[in-house]
């Protein structure tokens, strides 16, 4: 009897669909990111699951607002994931 799915070598797509604790190698899904302010182009480091409103240090505009999970970036803000 041959299994249709290889349990020891799962595909990357199937691992990303699983819950973070049920993956073959457990790991967090949160990250830090550099967010660029659309008004003054100042870069601020923000946590992806921030629980408070993040404000730009120089022009005091709102960069992201918290939701139940990940923080929502405001319109016009661009981000880059940090390594």
Curated annotation (Swiss-Prot):
A zinc finger (C4-type) spans 37-59. This is Small ribosomal subunit protein eS27. Keywords: Cytoplasm, Metal-binding, Ribonucleoprotein, Ribosomal protein, Zinc, Zinc-finger. It comes from Schizosaccharomyces pombe (strain 972 / ATCC 24843) (Fission yeast). Belongs to the eukaryotic ribosomal protein eS27 family. HAMAP family: Ribosomal_eS27 (MF_00371). One of its GO terms (cellular component) is cytosol. Its cofactor is Zn(2+). Binds 1 zinc ion per subunit. Component of the ribosome, a large ribonucleoprotein complex responsible for the synthesis of proteins in the cell. The small ribosomal subunit (SSU) binds messenger RNAs (mRNAs) and translates the encoded message by selecting cognate aminoacyl-transfer RNA (tRNA) molecules. The large subunit (LSU) contains the ribosomal catalytic site termed the peptidyl transferase center (PTC), which catalyzes the formation of peptide bonds, thereby polymerizing the amino acids delivered by tRNAs into a polypeptide chain. Component of the small ribosomal subunit (SSU). Mature yeast ribosomes consist of a small (40S) and a large (60S) subunit. The 40S small subunit contains 1 molecule of ribosomal RNA (18S rRNA) and at least 33 different proteins. The large 60S subunit contains 3 rRNA molecules (25S, 5.8S and 5S rRNA) and at least 46 different proteins. One of its GO terms (biological process) is ribosomal small subunit assembly. It is found in: Cytoplasm. GO terms for molecular function: RNA binding; structural constituent of ribosome; zinc ion binding. Its main location: cytoplasm. It comes from the Eukaryota. InterPro entries: Ribosomal_eS27 (IPR000592), Ribosomal_eS27_Zn-bd_dom_sf (IPR023407), Ribosomal_zn-bd (IPR011332).
